[in-house]
Amino acid sequence: MLQLIGKGTTQKQQIEGGQKVKKAGIELSIYFMPGAGGKQYTEKNAIDTANVINAVNPDFVRLRTFVVKSDSLMYDIVKSGEFTECSDIEKLLEIKIMLEHIQNCNGYLASDHIINLLQNVNGYLDKDKNAMLDYINTFLALPRKTQRKYQIARRMGFAGDWTMLDKLSMHYQYIIEQYEKNVSDGKQFEKLLNQYMDNYI
């Protein structure tokens, strides 16, 4: 995975470096990019990241959802067919897999960027892990129509969760309803979401 995205380090080097930082008493954050491996490496990306977290026990794990920005080198790679981007939901599933594989860690998981689909996935990995997984599973169990409405709202900058969609203005509720109804093709729907996310990266 690290070689695929040109990180310039190995998993072993990241673990050794992280352990040295922790031993020195310096606050450490590990960033997880769900979707960075594309569809081909989605599970590997999640499990490999969990293994590093387990070995290092960082103070923070910060979520930074991977998005392919238009007119970027990665965008050209996607168009060439060499890389297949994960859907919004698949990236969320990656976060779930990562969480499920984290053990004996007490750092804080922070969904602290607007690019993340669920901003309320926050908590301590020892005390709040099950609650975070329950929150993700609750969203995944929603009717697809509700998920899609929330995805559109979130990508338009909505800071609440799906239980608060009725707090949006009638204008935005109408726009979201029209998008949800008229953009039925899955690829076109993901393209719509990415157009909004382009504004944040």
Feature locations, PLM:
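An N-terminal domain-start capping segment
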Residues: E16-E27, N116-N120, D126
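A cross-domain feature marking catalytic cores of carbohydrate-active enzymes
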Residues: I30-P34, L63-T65, S111-H113
